[in-house]
Amino acid sequence: MSIKRLVQLFVAVVVLHSCGKKVSTEEFNSDFSLFKDYILNFSSGLVSSNTDIRVTLAFDKAEWQPNQEIDQSLFDISPAVKGKMMALTSNTIAFIPEKPLEQDTEYRIVFKLSKLIKTPKNLSEFKFSIKTLKQDFIVNVLDLQSYNREWQFLN
């Protein structure tokens, strides 16, 4: 009888945990003002699905050459995206996706700053998010009209 109760309790805890609320974007994103000594700029807000994800650092990495592929593990992106990390300049890195990002999707990025420079423990990861635009274009064509034999127009 007690094993049955334990199993029921376990199932109840699992169900309640799986129904927990998701962390909002505001709660996920790091406070940029805390990172101003390390990060100058980063991708944010609404972006095209064909864009890359960039972070501009407040310091230079002399060992980086323009368009050099760098460590993939600097970014954790959710939902997962395949692509490569590139050093665009000595202080700008970009994640370049293999395929365009999904439209109308929020991506959460964790930038592991402590892999590049020594930081206080509370500043080891910079979290930010972007949302891709929904590409939407509608053309309504009614019929073809003509002015004369050489000129036509659409209604």
Language-model-detected regions and their locations in the chain:
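Sec-dependent signal peptide recognition
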Residues: K4-V11
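Acidic, low-complexity Ser/Thr/Gly/Pro-rich repeat segments typical of extracellular/periplasmic
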Residues: G20-N155
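C-terminal motif of bacterial Sec signal peptides marking the signal peptidase cleavage site
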Residues: V15-S18
